[in-house]
């Protein structure tokens, strides 16, 4: 099941691809840990929007721990192919990555609803509690896991996609399930995102029509800018891959080899969440201040420990 890597069969291309996937994995792992730690241990960030951001980072962290390492190993050992088509490992990997992606999409929808409520209905927004937010997050995760259960329990075709080094659903053989997943996950989310986003954008473009409370909220709450950048980076990271697949669907398969281009576009989309840490640092002063204070505190504690150890060593002869 886990064949040893044959070092003699490694090529420059396989090493380059494995290095790129490893870099994405490390970046995603480190930034997710930092995001979760700073938000969870900063009281000013532990609000409703902070819970949604932690949910997004947890999905990224699980991807970095359970999904991407399989792609690294498969790149180095080309004959393994994540256990092969329809293997339990391949099905589990496909299930996990689709479930995590669905939970991310649902969380984006809840973020849009939260920002819409804060902007358009500030009097009712105060009724939003952390308990209700956590219930919506749990509901989103359970729904995502249950919707993707047929991948494991049913005889659905899962194939290894060598251009991306990932296991994916054979959409041609699972068209009914694919349409159901599209209607239950992506269509409601897209409608919610575009509807609420357009209303928020229209209101912010006409600040004279806003109430004083709404205008003050827009000017003082950095979460509007933060969530806006999150949506833009998510869209831009997936745009090249979507454009390539749409072109292949419309004009048919091209004569040129697009495997390397597909590989880069897939892992560009996977690496998109790595930008969350930079977005939080540049748009939220509380996140930036907390992170810098943790860094300075850890450096001070480390230097103090070294000083005490050095002092004990110098006085050990007394």
From Swiss-Prot:
GO cellular component, one term: plasma membrane
Tissue: Expressed in multiple neurons including ciliated neurons in the head, and cholinergic and noncholinergic neurons in the ventral nerve cord. Also expressed in vulval muscles, non-neuronal cells in the tail and rectal epithelial cells. Not detected in body wall muscles.
Keyword Acyltransferase listed: no
GO molecular function terms noted in the UniProt entry: G protein-coupled receptor activity
Cellular localisation: Cell membrane
Disulphide-bonded residues: 90-167
Gene Ontology biological process terms in this record: cellular response to hormone stimulus; G protein-coupled receptor signaling pathway
Topological domains annotated Extracellular: 1-17, 73-92, 155-175, 245-257
Principal cellular location given in the protein's record: membrane
Cytoplasmic-facing ranges: 42-47, 114-134, 195-223, 283-318
Keyword Cell membrane recorded: yes
Effect of residue 148 to Y: In zw82; ameliorates the sluggish phenotype caused by a hyperactive slo-1 mutant
UniProt keywords, alphabetically: Cell membrane, Disulfide bond, G-protein coupled receptor, Membrane, Receptor, Transducer, Transmembrane, Transmembrane helix
Topology relative to the membrane: Multi-pass membrane protein
Positions of transmembrane segments: 18-41, 48-72, 93-113, 135-154, 176-194, 224-244, 258-282
Domain of life per record: Eukaryota
Family named by the database record: Belongs to the G-protein coupled receptor 1 family.
Function: Probable high affinity receptor for melatonin. Modulates potassium channel slo-1 activity to inhibit neurotransmitter release at synaptic junctions and promote a sleep-like state, called lethargus, during larval development. May function presynaptically to regulate synaptic transmission. Required in rectal epithelial cells to promote pathogen clearance, acting upstream of multiple G proteins including egl-30.
The protein's name in its UniProt record: Melatonin receptor pdcr-1
């Amino acid at each position: 099941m886990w064949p040893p890597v044959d070092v003699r069969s490694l090529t420059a291309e396989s090493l380059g691809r494995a290095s790129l996937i490893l870099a994405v994995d490390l970046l995603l792992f480190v930034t997710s840990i930092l995001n979760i730690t700073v938000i969870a241990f900063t009281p000013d960030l532990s609000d409703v929007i902070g819970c949604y951001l932690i949910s997004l980072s947890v999905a990224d962290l699980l991807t970095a721990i359970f999904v991407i390492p399989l792609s690294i190993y498969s790149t180095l050992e080309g004959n393994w192919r994540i256990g092969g088509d329809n293997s339990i490992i391949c099905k589990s990997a496909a299930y996990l990555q689709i479930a995590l992606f669905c939970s991310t999409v649902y969380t984006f929808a809840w973020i849009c609803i939260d920002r819409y409520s804060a902007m358009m209905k500030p009097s009712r927004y105060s009724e939003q509690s952390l308990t209700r937010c956590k219930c919506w997050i749990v509901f989103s995760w359970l729904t995502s896991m249950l919707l993707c259960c047929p991948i494991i329990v049913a005889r659905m075709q899962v194939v290894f996609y060598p251009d991306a080094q990932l296991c994916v659903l054979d959409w041609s053989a699972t068209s009914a399930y694919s349409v159901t997943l599209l209607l239950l996950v992506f269509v409601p989310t897209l409608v919610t995102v575009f509807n609420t986003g357009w209303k928020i954008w229209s209101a912010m473009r006409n600040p004279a029509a806003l109430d004083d409370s709404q205008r003050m909220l827009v000017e003082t709450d950095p979460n509007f800018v933060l969530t806006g950048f999150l949506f833009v980076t998510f869209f831009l990271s997936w745009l090249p891959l979507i454009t390539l697949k749409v072109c292949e669907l419309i004009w048919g398969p091209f004569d040129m080899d697009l495997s390397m281009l597909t590989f880069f576009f897939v892992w560009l989309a996977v690496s998109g969440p790595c930008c969350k840490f930079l977005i939080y640092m540049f748009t939220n002063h509380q996140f930036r201040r907390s992170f810098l204070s943790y860094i300075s505190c850890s450096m001070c504690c480390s230097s103090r420990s070294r000083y005490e150890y050095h002092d004990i060593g110098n006085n050990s002869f007394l």
